[in-house]
């Protein structure tokens, strides 16, 4: 009897790991598609450029971007606040490091699941939907990035919290 319970318990534990792995795969397919970047409407531009002043600046620096603040703090870009507009430029070090991409802007990596924390069980309806709580971190961070300069960027030094709904399809779990 003890052996049966032990085998059944091990099977349940392994089933949970598989589900966790499936959730991680589905979330990574969604959040890992694009790089984590500071971008403009038209990235194919020459520097320095004038930027409109943000109406609300969540950073308090005038940039309204913690990613841009990291590039400025590391000395790869320059940012000057003006009366009616701001000016953004790239330093010689930034040019050498190729910090600006004409397709994506200035990127610091891409997001990937760090840990699946918990999930809801699918309901009894026609569609199986779960809410997954997880943490993510930045991966594929360029080697020339000083992580201290980018300490305010979520996921750079510490995992960031997030949640996502996943739907069970005939091809496995998918993010909506």
Regions inferred by a protein language model and the residue ranges of each:
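Short, cysteine-centered beta-strand-loop-beta hairpins and adjacent loop/turn segments enriched
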Residues: 135-156
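Accessory beta->alpha helical hairpin/"wing" motif in late/C-terminal subdomains of nucleic-acid enzymes
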Residues: 68, 74-113, 119
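C-terminal motif of bacterial Sec signal peptides marking the signal peptidase cleavage site
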Residues: 14-16
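Bacterial lipoprotein signal-peptidase II cleavage site
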Residues: 18-24
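Short beta-strand edge/turn micro-motifs at domain boundaries
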Residues: 131-136, 155-176
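Short amphipathic alpha-helical interaction segments
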Residues: 53-74, 107-111, 136, 158-159
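Positively charged n-region of N-terminal signal peptides that target proteins for export
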Residues: 1-4
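Post-signal peptide N-terminal segment of mature Sec-exported envelope proteins
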Residues: 25-46
